[in-house]
Amino acid sequence: MQPETSDQMLYSFLAGNEVGGGGYCVSGDYMTTMQSLCGSSSSTSSYYPLAISGIGETMAQDRALAALRNHKEAERRRRERINSHLNKLRNVLSCNSKTDKATLLAKVVQRVRELKQQTLETSDSDQTLLPSETDEISVLHFGDYSNDGHIIFKASLCCEDRSDLLPDLMEILKSLNMKTLRAEMVTIGGRTRSVLVVAADKEMHGVESVHFLQNALKSLLERSSKSLMERSSGGGGGERSKRRRALDHIIMV
């Protein structure tokens, strides 16, 4: 008997050849093929949970990496802001760019204390800012701060108000290599009082510089008085200003 061909095997399966119990007769080759397919399907199904688990782990790792990158970026921006503020403080206090943070913050605390003390000392004299009827000069040695290399002076000038008074004051301070830290000016009824807090380099100035500043301000007042008298002596009448005042030279050291 010749072996069945594949067409005959398929026909036998479809025709349903009966076997003693009325079942179907299926060839061994066909059953082997079906079992192979079933086995492959089972293997594929068992693979899917592992693949899904791997995807979940990958997503968790991606989220962790994204959170880490965000944290690093936030930390970088925070450090940039801190360094920017520190550089501004270095510029305000005239510190070297290499000054470390601890030294810089110590200088800031010291400067704040100095300003607080100056505020307390000057608050008592606020009522005396109003200009008087007498020309006055007052020059004080206001403080000695060796840490930042500057010596502080306080100068007060009361005289007739004129448009070029402030430029003349600035020119005097510039000629003496002094820098203005604070300035207050009050003008009432043609009279003005200027109170200046100035700083000078300790390598160029000492306590004796009080006299240099005082003499420069005295010269300024004398020029101002002379100019005022010349302007008030208009025409041929020679009438002098009724507001002419003598110079009371007050020096406090």
UniProtKB/Swiss-Prot annotation:
Domain of life assignment: Eukaryota
One GO BP: hyperosmotic salinity response
Gene3D superfamilies the record matches: Helix-loop-helix DNA-binding domain (4.10.280.10)
Segments passing through the bilayer: none
Main location: nucleus
Record's keyword terms, sorted: DNA-binding, Nucleus, Transcription, Transcription regulation
One GO CC term on file: nucleus
SUPFAM superfamilies per record: HLH, helix-loop-helix DNA-binding domain
Domain bHLH: 66-115
Pfam hit, one: HLH
Molecular-function GO term, any one: DNA-binding transcription factor activity
Disulfide bonds: none
Cell compartments where the protein resides: Nucleus
Record text on subunit structure and interactions: Homodimer.
Stated name of the protein: Transcription factor bHLH106
Source organism of this protein record: Arabidopsis thaliana (Mouse-ear cress)
